[in-house]
């Protein structure tokens, strides 16, 4: 059975690159009818935090990336790492190294000055020296000194690395905690991971991890290293490109299905399909379709996708999502029925839930029109026409159809074109020049509030 995993370190939030890796691993497992595992690699005691763990769990939940096992925590498996390290020591496949940090720093400096690649020189590999008193050793793997590590990467193709280019990597630190390479190998082995899907910044780790597996006599999983994500300028993605946490996008009013759709298209494609559901992603997903070239992060494309999903979203769901944004702005919440109508009216004009909240402002408070709009539309000539319309509106049943009829009748009786009246009316009521159809806006605003705003605005007309 296919089994994949996502194994983040809890040293920050779930960022775009990590979320894409999780998505690819999740989609492949679902496509193959396999299992997806979540594992928290928390052995970096100085940087790992419970807050980061929660941020990762929240991000996964929001994206809908459900896992079949986990979350597992490396720090709960320390005995296992120490047990296997002891086994390798007993078999002569690993050794204890007592070299101090100062010694290793001096060695690297000598190698640098000599123009050599910095690497451990194996000074304790076959040493019969008496261990220094009071020094806790690290445990190093006896890396083969001849031959090659060869593996077929499911994205990059065949990769071959000479063993003489690899030094004897540390398996256990002096405090008994595993290094990344040792911990991840044992975790994948014990959890039955068949396919390791991860960023290509881990390619150089793979030969080292394969050598550990060979020392253990274990089966080698299949590897798929996905290309990194770049900013539009070709530089590695960072915060200045908008590469913030997944939850930041939620807080800005993006929908999870939009982010899933966008992340899937970062380095993977299915023909020319730009928009697809989670179910279609699972149906179509193929590791062979992942590009070997880096993907470029385009915030505008993500926003475009989000706009599409907003238009398609259920109004009741959008009401639930927009409410926190309205409360944050101290807007008085109307009845749910009215809020449903407001959302339905405005959602085609918004790119995010946050924009939807901002666009609805004139339904909840009076907005002063900018000077340029007042100068353009509040003229002495149009004032008597508006006064006539206000008198007519005060007498009608408040429905969109009757509102539209009165505006149209007023335009006709005064020999005007529709925009000549609709635009001043729009600016008077909303403070903006661009809104949905003015009759729809007035209906939702309500008769009392509409007349109150129109009569109040008459005072600022010239003449």
Swiss-Prot record:
GO biological process: glutamyl-tRNA aminoacylation
Enzyme class: ligase
Top-rank lineage group of the source organism: Bacteria
UniProt: ATP binding residues: 239
Motif 'HIGH' region, residue numbers: 8-18
UniProt keywords, alphabetically: Aminoacyl-tRNA synthetase, ATP-binding, Cytoplasm, Ligase, Nucleotide-binding, Protein biosynthesis
Disulfide bonds: none
GO cellular component: cytosol
Subcellular location, record wording: Cytoplasm
Main location, first listed in the record: cytoplasm
Residue positions of motif 'KMSKS' region: 236-240
Record's catalysed reaction(s): tRNA(Glu) + L-glutamate + ATP = L-glutamyl-tRNA(Glu) + AMP + diphosphate
GO molecular function, one term: zinc ion binding
EC number: 6.1.1.17
Database matches in HAMAP family: Glu_tRNA_synth_type1
Entry similarity comment: Belongs to the class-I aminoacyl-tRNA synthetase family. Glutamate--tRNA ligase type 1 subfamily.
Role description: Catalyzes the attachment of glutamate to tRNA(Glu) in a two-step reaction: glutamate is first activated by ATP to form Glu-AMP and then transferred to the acceptor end of tRNA(Glu).
Subunit (UniProt): Monomer.
Protein's recorded name: Glutamate--tRNA ligase
Species per Swiss-Prot/TrEMBL record: Nitrosomonas europaea (strain ATCC 19718 / CIP 103999 / KCTC 2705 / NBRC 14298)
Gene name linked to the record: gltX
């Amino acid at each position: 059975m296919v089994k994949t995993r996502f194994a983040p370190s809890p040293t920050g939030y779930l960022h775009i690159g990590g979320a894409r890796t999780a998505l690819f691993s999740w989609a492949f497992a679902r496509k193959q009818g396999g299992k997806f595992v979540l594992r928290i690699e928390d052995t970096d005691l100085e940087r790992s935090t419970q807050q980061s763990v929660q941020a990762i769990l929240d991000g996964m939940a929001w994206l809908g990336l459900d896992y079949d096992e986990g979350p597992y925590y490396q720090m709960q498996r320390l005995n296992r790492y120490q047990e296997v390290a002891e086994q390798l020591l007993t078999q002569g496949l690993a050794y204890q190294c007592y070299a101090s940090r100062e010694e290793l720093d001096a060695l690297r400096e000598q190698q640098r000055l000599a123009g050599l690649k910095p690497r451990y020189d194996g000074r304790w590999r076959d040493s019969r020296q008496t261990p220094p008193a009071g020094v806790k050793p690290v445990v190093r793997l006896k890396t083969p000194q001849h031959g090659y590590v060869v593996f077929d990467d499911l994205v990059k193709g065949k990769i071959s690395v000479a063993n003489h280019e690899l030094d004897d990597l540390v398996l256990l630190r002096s405090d008994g905690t595993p290094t990344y390479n040792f911990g991840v190998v044992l975790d994948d082995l014990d959890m039955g991971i068949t396919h390791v899907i991860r960023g290509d910044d881990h390619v150089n780790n793979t030969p080292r991890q394969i050598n550990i597996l060979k020392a253990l006599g274990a089966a080698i999983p299949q590897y798929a290293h996905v290309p990194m994500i770049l900013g539009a300028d070709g530089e590695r993605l960072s915060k200045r490109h908008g590469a913030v946490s997944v939850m930041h996008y939620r807080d800005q009013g993006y929908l999870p299905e939009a982010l899933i759709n966008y992340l899937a298209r970062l380095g993977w494609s299915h023909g020319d399909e730009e928009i697809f559901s989670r179910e279609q992603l699972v149906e179509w997903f193929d590791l062979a379709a992942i590009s070997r070239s880096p993907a470029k992060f385009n915030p505008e494309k993500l926003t475009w996708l989000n706009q599409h999903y907003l238009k398609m979203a259920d109004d009741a769901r959008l009401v639930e999502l927009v409410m926190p944004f309205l409360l944050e702005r101290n807007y008085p919440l109307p009845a749910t029925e009215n809020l449903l109508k407001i959302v339905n009216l405005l959602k085609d004009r918004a790119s995010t839930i946050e924009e939807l909240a901002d666009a609805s402002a004139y339904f909840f408070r009076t907005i002063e029109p900018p000077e340029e709009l007042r100068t353009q539309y509040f003229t002495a000539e149009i004032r008597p026409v508006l006064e006539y319309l206000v008198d007519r509106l005060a007498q009608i049943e408040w429905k969109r159809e009757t509102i539209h009829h009165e505006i149209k009748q007023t335009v006709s009786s005064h020999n005007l074109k529709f925009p000549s009246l609709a635009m001043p009316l729009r600016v008077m009521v909303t403070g903006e020049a661009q809104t949905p159809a003015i009759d729809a806006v007035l209906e939702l605003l309500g008769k009392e509030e509409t007349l109150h705003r129109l009569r109040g605005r008459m005072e600022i007309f010239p003449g």
